[in-house]
Each structure stands twice: as C-alpha cells, then as structure tokens.
C-alpha cells in the first residue's frame, strides 16, 4: 500500500460515516463485578493487621537473653514449655525477604489461620541479625489479643532466628 491508497481509503470511510450519530446507552445497567473470595479475605487481613499492630507501641521486652513474653493471667509453665520445645508448631511463617508492611499482614493472617484451624502453636521465622523484622515481630505479637505467649524457638525450629508463639484458641483441649 502507498500513501495515496491510504488517503483515498480514509476519504471513502469519512464519506460513509459522515451523518452517523453515536447511540446513547439508556437500556442496560451494568453491575460492578463481585469481589472474589481472595480479595475479601485480603481486605479483612489488612483491616485486622492495621487494627492490632502499631509500629509506635514499645512494650517492655527483654534486652538480653532469649526473646520471650507471657500475657497476664497465663501460667508461667506455658513459657517454660515453649522454651523446652514441648509444643510442636502446626503452622510455620517464614518472613525472610518481606517488607515490614507485608510481614504485618502475613503475621495477622497466620494468627487468624491458627484460630480457624484450632492450632495452638505456630512458628514465626524472622531471621538472624539485628534486622527490623527481628525487632518488630515481638512488638506486634505482644499487641495481638489472641497471643498468649512467645519464646525464642529451640534449635530444631530456628533458634534465635525464630519465635514459637502460643495462640489462644478458646476452650479447646490443649495439644502438645
């Protein structure tokens, strides 16, 4: 094709559609598409994560020794059981490579999954070193109402790069 054919074709097309007006759409009303189950669950997780976890809250946590915390009203024997590895985590969460905002959502989803699946213990792997997640994860866990206790994990579950978390699943028989 050359330029003369293009110009001629455009002129013919323009002549054909010269008096045509667009039709106004007044008969069909299109509904907004329904949200998928995944989108709804993600929105709920974000809502829960934002309502439970604050980055400005600074709880009193141990500076030296293993990272540990016990909620008020929980028997101190539970913390000892976590330390010894008596509880086997049913769910594991590896936060390596996550940003802080993503890790917060994943942590909220893990706790929600534990409650839903009646899992009393889970393991959160935040990594070695002095990274931001290693500092933030314990602070977030302290703020969640379903967390009864946490302790630095035994060697077989990650040692000082992980935390074993005890979740309050209600009046269910305790599993170890």
Curated annotation (Swiss-Prot):
<dbReference type="InterPro" id="IPR022990">
    <property type="entry name" value="SmrB-like"/>
</dbReference>
<keyword id="KW-0699">rRNA-binding</keyword>
<dbReference type="GO" id="GO:0072344">
    <property type="term" value="P:rescue of stalled ribosome"/>
</dbReference>
<comment type="function">
    <text>Acts as a ribosome collision sensor. Detects stalled/collided disomes (pairs of ribosomes where the leading ribosome is stalled and a second ribosome has collided with it) and endonucleolytically cleaves mRNA at the 5' boundary of the stalled ribosome. Stalled/collided disomes form a new interface (primarily via the 30S subunits) that binds SmrB. Cleaved mRNA becomes available for tmRNA ligation, leading to ribosomal subunit dissociation and rescue of stalled ribosomes.</text>
</comment>
<dbReference type="GO" id="GO:0004521">
    <property type="term" value="F:RNA endonuclease activity"/>
</dbReference>
<keyword id="KW-0694">RNA-binding</keyword>
<keyword id="KW-0540">Nuclease</keyword>
<dbReference type="InterPro" id="IPR036063">
    <property type="entry name" value="Smr_dom_sf"/>
</dbReference>
<comment type="subunit">
    <text>Associates with collided ribosomes, but not with correctly translating polysomes.</text>
</comment>
<dbReference type="GO" id="GO:0019843">
    <property type="term" value="F:rRNA binding"/>
</dbReference>
<comment type="similarity">
    <text>Belongs to the SmrB family.</text>
</comment>
<keyword id="KW-0378">Hydrolase</keyword>
<dbReference type="Pfam" id="PF01713">
    <property type="entry name" value="Smr"/>
</dbReference>
<feature type="domain" description="Smr">
    <location>
        <begin position="93"/>
        <end position="168"/>
    </location>
</feature>
<protein>
    <recommendedName>
        <fullName>Ribosome rescue factor SmrB</fullName>
        <ecNumber>3.1.-.-</ecNumber>
    </recommendedName>
</protein>
<keyword id="KW-0255">Endonuclease</keyword>
<dbReference type="InterPro" id="IPR002625">
    <property type="entry name" value="Smr_dom"/>
</dbReference>
